A protein has these predicted regions:
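Active-site rim helix/loop that mediates acceptor-substrate recognition in acyltransferases
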Residues: 1-7
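Acyl-donor (CoA/ACP) binding surface of acyl/acetyltransferases
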Residues: 7-112
Length: 112
């Protein structure tokens, strides 16, 4: 991490059941004014139900209110259609397609 960079996260519950995590890492309020986002829903049967989309919308709003950042970035593999769909549905735009360790990947951003 850069000096002054932070991380912040929350657990995701569906009913009373812990089903995943969402977090921002590398939160930089000084230089780049940005953070990076990660989210995981553990149980495949809960994918596609809007749970991750709602958690992402709520969490991003909270991060923009809590931290002095202008954008949030996210990486995903180009073959991960669900992740790309989630990010685009919640306001992220594709910025760059690149190859990492032989795998096509995508970088997306959402601006304040």
């Amino acid at each position: 991490f850069k000096d002054g960079a932070l991380s912040y996260g929350k657990v995701i519950y569906y009913g009373n059941k812990y089903i995943g995590d969402i977090w921002c890492y590398g939160i930089d309020e000084i230089n780049e004014k940005m953070a990076m986002l990660s989210i995981v829903i553990f149980e495949k049967e809960l994918w596609g139900k809007g749970i991750a989309a709602q958690a992402t919308k709520d969490f991003i709003k909270e991060v923009f209110n809590k931290y002095d950042v202008e954008k949030i970035g996210a990486f995903t593999y180009a073959f991960n259609d669900r992740s790309i769909g989630l990010l685009e549905k919640t306001g992220f735009s594709k910025i760059e397609i690149f190859i990492e360790d032989g795998i096509e990947s995508i970088y997306l951003e959402k601006h304040r």
